[in-house]
C-alpha cells in the first residue's frame, strides 16, 4: 500500500496512472506532485497503464495549451528568452513542446545512483524494475534535451557513458540494480551527438572529462568487431554472462553470443537485413560487413577529431582523421554496389546483401560518399516511392523487400532515428530541397498521431502513418520525438563540417523561439525571408528564403554559404566568426559590403 499522502491513481499527462501494490521507492522521484513511498525502500516500482485505460484516456488540455506559442515580439527577444522555454509558431506551433513533453515525462531521478536520465519509456522502467539506460536511445534523448536544457542533455550523455570506466564500452543497456549487457554495445553515436551540442561554443572542461570515455569506447570496435580482419565492422556479441540477477529475467542462452544478440547490438532487433546472416562463434560477430556500423564509426572518428582539436590534442585529432579516411575508403571500395547504385551490407563471401534499409544512406551522414554517388543514391533510391519514399517515410526496410509487409518493429515500420540520420546526410550533401520535404513529412507524421490520440510513438506504420496499430509501438516513447527534431533542425542546426545552418528554402512558414545553442537562446523566423536573433540581438536578415550556413571556429572555409535559387540580400549583424565572403550554389563568390550594422551581400539570379 502507498504510505505517502496522495492518490493511488489519477490522470497525468493524458494517461491514467495506477500504482498497484508497492509504489516507487521513496528515494526515486518521478516528476509527480507527490513522491510516493513504500515500507521497503528496495521494493521495485509497479507502474501500470492498462491498454483499456490508454484507449479511454481523454485529451489533455494542459498539454495542448502549452503546445503553441504566440509570435515572438521585441520584448520577448530583448528578454533573451530568459525562461528557457522552447516554443514555435506556424508549422512548428505544436512540435517543440510535444517533443519535450514526451522527454520530460520519461525523465527520472535515480537517488540511489545519483543520476538524472531520460529512459525510453516509463512503462519500460516498470517492466525492468527501475530506470533502464539504453545506449543510443540515451544519446538521442540528449540531442532532444539540448534544444531547451543543456544541463539535461549532459546528464543523459554522462549517464550513458558511465559504464565505460568499468566495461571499456557503452553497453546495450544498464538496469537500475546494476545488471548490464556485458556481451554487446550499441551504435557508436555518442561523440557525434555530444559534438553537435558543443560545437558552437565548446565547454572544454566538460569535454575533457568525457573525452577519455569516448576514446575508449571508440577503441572497442576494431578490437572486437572486425571479425574477418578486412578493416570493416560487423555487429556482434561476446561469450559473456549478461545477467547478474537471473531471477529478474529468465536465463536464455540465445540472449548472448548469438545472431539475435548481435542484432540487438545493432539496435535493429528483428531487421530483415540479418535474417539469413550466420553468426560466427569464433569471431563473435555476424558474417556481414555492415555499412551502417562502418558509417557510424566514420562519424565517431570525425567528432572525436573535432573534440581532440578543441582540447589541444592535434596529434590525436590527426590520427582520428586518418582513421576516418581509411574506413571511408574501405566503405567506398567494398560496400558500394555500382550495378545497383547503392551502399550495401556485404557477406563475408563477397556477395552484396539485397536487404536494403536506411543504413544504406548513412555514408552521407558520415560525409564519405563521393558527390556523384550521393546524387545517384538519393535520386534512384531514397526518393523512389517503390523503395523508401512515399506519403509516410522512411520505412525501416525497402518497400520492395518481402518483409516490408510484416509491419513489425524494424520490418517495415518508420523510426525517428532513421529519419534524423538520413536528414543529416541530405543536408551535409546540400540536398536541401529533399531534406526540407523529409522534415515536413516527418513533422506531418508526428503531428498526425499527436493530434489524434496524444501519442508520441516508438515507431509508425509506413503505409497508414498510424503509431498505435500494433502492440509493440510504445505510445509515449521518447525517440518518437526525433521526428519533431528533424523539423526543428530544418530551421537551425550545427553541421559536422563546422557550420551553423539557419533557414530553409522549402519548409512551410514557421518560427522557433528559445532554441538553446552555444550558451545562448536563438529565435529563427521563416516566411518570405529568414531572420535570426541570439539572446534578443539580431544575427541576420535575408530578404528571400534561403539556407544560410555560417562558419564556426572549426570550419575549414570561412565563407558564408547561401543556398537559394532566388535573388536577394543578406545582412549579417553578428556571426560566430567574422565573415566578409559568401558563396552561392554553383560557386559564385560574393564580397560583402561592411557598414556599422554589419556585412551585407546582394545577388541576382
Report each predicted region and the residues it spans.
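Substrate-binding groove/exosite segments of carbohydrate-active enzymes
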Residues: 90-195, 199-200, 204-208, 215, ...
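Terminal accessory carbohydrate-recognition/targeting modules of carbohydrate-active enzymes
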Residues: 1-91, 95, 136, 428, ...
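Helix-terminus loop motifs that line ligand-binding clefts
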Residues: 149-242, 332-346, 386-404, 441-473
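Low-complexity, Ser/Thr/Pro/Gly-enriched N-terminal "stalk/linker" regions
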Residues: 43-45, 51-57, 63-131, 155, ...
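The feature captures the catalytic groove of carbohydrate-active enzymes
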Residues: 38-43, 167, 171-189, 195-199, ...
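C-terminal capping/lid segments that line or modulate ligand- or cofactor-binding pockets
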Residues: 181, 186-200, 336-381, 385, ...
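Alpha-helical scaffold segments in carbohydrate-active enzymes
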Residues: 98, 102, 159, 213-227, ...
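Structural helix-adjacent loops and short alpha-helical linkers that scaffold large soluble proteins
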Residues: 92, 145-157, 197-215, 306-326, ...
Amino acid at each position: 500500500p502507498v504510505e505517502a499522502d496522495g492518490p493511488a491513481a489519477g490522470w497525468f499527462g493524458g494517461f491514467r496512472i495506477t500504482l498497484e501494490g508497492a509504489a516507487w521507492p521513496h528515494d526515486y522521484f518521478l516528476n509527480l506532485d507527490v513522491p510516493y513511498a513504500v515500507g521497503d525502500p528496495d521494493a521495485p516500482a509497479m507502474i501500470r497503464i492498462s491498454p483499456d485505460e490508454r484507449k479511454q484516456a481523454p485529451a489533455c488540455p494542459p498539454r495542448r495549451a502549452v503546445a503553441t506559442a504566440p509570435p515572438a515580439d521585441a520584448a520577448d527577444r530583448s528578454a533573451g528568452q530568459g525562461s528557457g522555454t522552447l516554443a514555435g509558431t506556424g508549422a512548428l506551433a505544436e512540435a517543440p513542446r510535444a517533443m519535450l513533453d514526451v522527454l520530460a515525462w520519461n525523465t527520472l531521478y535515480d537517488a540511489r545512483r545519483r543520476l538524472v536520465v531520460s529512459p525510453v519509456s516509463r512503462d519500460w522502467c516498470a517492466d525492468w524494475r527501475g530506470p533502464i539506460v539504453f545506449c543510443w536511445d540515451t544519446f538521442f534523448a540528449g540531442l532532444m534535451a539540448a534544444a531547451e536544457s543543456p544541463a539535461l542533455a549532459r546528464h543523459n550523455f554522462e549517464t550513458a557513458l558511465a559504464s565505460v570506466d568499468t566495461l571499456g564500452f557503452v553497453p546495450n543497456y544498464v538496469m537500475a540494480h546494476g545488471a548490464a549487457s556485458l556481451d554487446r554495445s550499441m551504435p557508436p553515436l555518442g561523440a557525434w551527438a555530444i559534438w553537435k551540442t558543443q560545437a558552437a561554443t565548446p565547454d572544454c572542461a566538460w569535454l575533457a572529462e568525457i573525452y577519455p570515455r569516448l576514446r575508449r569506447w571508440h577503441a572497442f570496435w576494431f578490437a572486437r568487431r572486425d571479425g574477418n580482419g578486412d578493416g570493416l565492422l560487423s555487429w556482434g556479441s561476446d561469450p559473456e554472462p549478461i545477467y547478474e540477477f537471473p531471477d529478474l529475467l529468465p536465463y536464455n542462452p540465445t540472449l548472448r553470443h548469438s545472431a539475435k544478440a548481435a542484432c540487438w547490438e545493432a539496435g535493429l532487433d528483428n531487421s530483415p537485413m540479418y535474417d539469413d546472416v550466420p553468426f560466427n562463434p569464433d569471431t563473435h560477430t555476424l558474417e556481414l560487413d555492415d555499412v551502417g556500423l562502418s558509417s557510424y564509426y566514420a562519424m565517431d572518428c570525425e567528432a572525436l577529431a573535432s573534440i581532440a582539436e578543441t582540447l589541444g590534442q592535434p596529434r590525436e585529432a590527426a590520427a582520428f582523421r586518418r582513421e576516418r579516411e581509411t574506413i571511408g575508403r574501405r566503405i567506398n571500395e567494398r560496400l558500394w554496389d555500382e550495378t545497383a547504385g547503392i551502399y550495401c551490407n556485404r557477406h563475408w563471401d563477397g556477395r552484396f546483401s539485397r536487404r536494403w534499409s536506411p543504413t544504406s544512406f548513412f555514408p552521407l551522414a558520415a560525409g564519405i560518399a563521393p558527390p556523384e554517388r550521393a546524387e545517384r543514391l538519393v535520386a534512384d533510391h531514397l526518393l523512389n516511392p517503390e523503395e523508401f519514399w512515399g506519403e509516410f517515410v522512411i520505412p525501416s526496410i525497402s518497400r520492395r523487400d518481402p518483409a516490408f509487409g510484416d509491419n513489425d518493429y524494424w520490418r517495415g515500420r518508420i523510426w525517428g532515428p532513421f529519419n534524423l540520420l538520413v536528414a543529416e546526410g541530405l543536408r551535409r550533401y546540400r540536398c536541401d530541397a529533399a531534406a526540407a520535404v523529409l522534415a515536413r513529412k516527418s513533422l506531418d507524421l508526428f503531428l498526425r498521431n499527436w493530434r489524434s490520440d496524444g501519442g508520441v510513438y516508438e515507431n509508425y506504420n509506413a503505409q497508414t502513418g498510424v503509431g498505435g496499430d500494433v502492440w509493440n509501438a510504445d505510445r509515449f516513447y521518447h525517440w518518437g520525438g526525433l521526428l519533431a527534431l528533424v523539423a526543428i533542425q530544418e530551421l537551425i542546426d550545427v553541421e559536422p563540417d563546422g557550420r551553423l545552418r539557419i533557414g530553409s528554402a522549402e519548409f512551410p512558414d514557421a518560427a522557433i523561439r528559445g532554441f538553446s545553442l552555444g550558451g545562448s537562446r536563438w529565435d529563427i523566423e521563416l516566411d518570405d525571408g529568414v531572420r535570426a536573433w541570439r539572446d534578443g540581438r539580431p544575427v541576420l536578415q535575408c530578404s528571400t528564403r534561403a539556407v544560410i550556413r555560417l562558419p564556426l571556429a572549426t570550419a575549414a572555409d570561412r565563407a558564408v554559404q547561401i543556398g537559394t535559387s532566388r535573388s536577394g540580400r543578406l545582412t549579417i549583424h553578428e556571426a560566430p566568426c567574422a565573415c566578409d565572403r559568401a558563396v552561392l550554389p554553383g560557386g559564385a563568390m560574393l564580397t560583402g559590403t561592411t557598414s556599422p550594422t554589419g556585412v551585407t551581400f546582394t545577388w541576382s539570379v
